[in-house]
Amino acid sequence: MAVLSKEYGFVILTGAASFLMVTHLAINVSKARKKYKVEYPTMYSTDPENGHIFNCIQRAHQNTLEVYPPFLFFLAVGGVYHPRIVSGLGLAWIVGRVLYAYGYYTGEPRKRQRGALSFIALIGLMGTTVCSAFQHLGWVRTGLNSGCKSCH
């Protein structure tokens, strides 16, 4: 039986916080559906006056959902060997996705770039996952004082 470190609790809390962020974005889409009168199952508005804003709110949520599975995978796996680093990167990803969404909500898609932090954090999470795989396979030693190359 594998035993996770006590610090893995931070990873679990980060995953829970990410769910709250995704839920927040979903609620924003629901509110926008009412405001802009876009009924289910219609995905996008064709209203020439306000449809663009609704579509930006919808896309911000969908774009986040598109990267959510890899985020959760990298969070869970990278956190096995690097729970603190992964939790910090996970929180940066969450903040970045909120900045991305609210930039997109302006109706000017280029303002999504405010959330570039989320992309950088996701690359970092991928790196910790690859590093964790190397450590698990014994290709690098674990720990800072191992006397050889490691992923730390």
UniProtKB/Swiss-Prot annotation:
One of its GO terms (cellular component) is mitochondrial outer membrane. This is Glutathione S-transferase 3, mitochondrial. It comes from the Eukaryota. Residues 1-8, 92-119 are mitochondrial intermembrane. The keyword DNA-binding does not apply. It is a multi-pass membrane protein. Keywords: Lipid metabolism, Lipoprotein, Lyase, Membrane, Mitochondrion, Mitochondrion outer membrane, Oxidoreductase, Palmitate, Transferase, Transmembrane, Transmembrane helix. Displays both glutathione S-transferase and glutathione peroxidase activities toward oxyeicosanoids. Catalyzes the Michael addition reaction of reduced glutathione (GSH) to electrophilic eicosanoids to form GSH adducts, as part of detoxification or metabolic shunt processes. Mediates GSH conjugation to leukotriene A4 to form the sulfidopeptide leukotriene C4. Metabolizes cyclopentenone prostanoids, specifically mediates GSH addition at C9 within the cyclopentenone ring of 15-deoxy-Delta12,14-prostaglandin J2 (15dPGJ2) to form 15dPGJ2-glutathione. L-cysteine cannot substitute for GSH. Residues 30-70, 141-152 are cytoplasmic. It catalyses: leukotriene C4 = leukotriene A4 + glutathione; 15-deoxy-Delta(12,14)-prostaglandin J2 + glutathione = 15-deoxy-Delta(12,14)-prostaglandin J2-S-(R)-glutathione; (5S)-hydroperoxy-(6E,8Z,11Z,14Z)-eicosatetraenoate + 2 glutathione = (5S)-hydroxy-(6E,8Z,11Z,14Z)-eicosatetraenoate + glutathione disulfide + H2O.
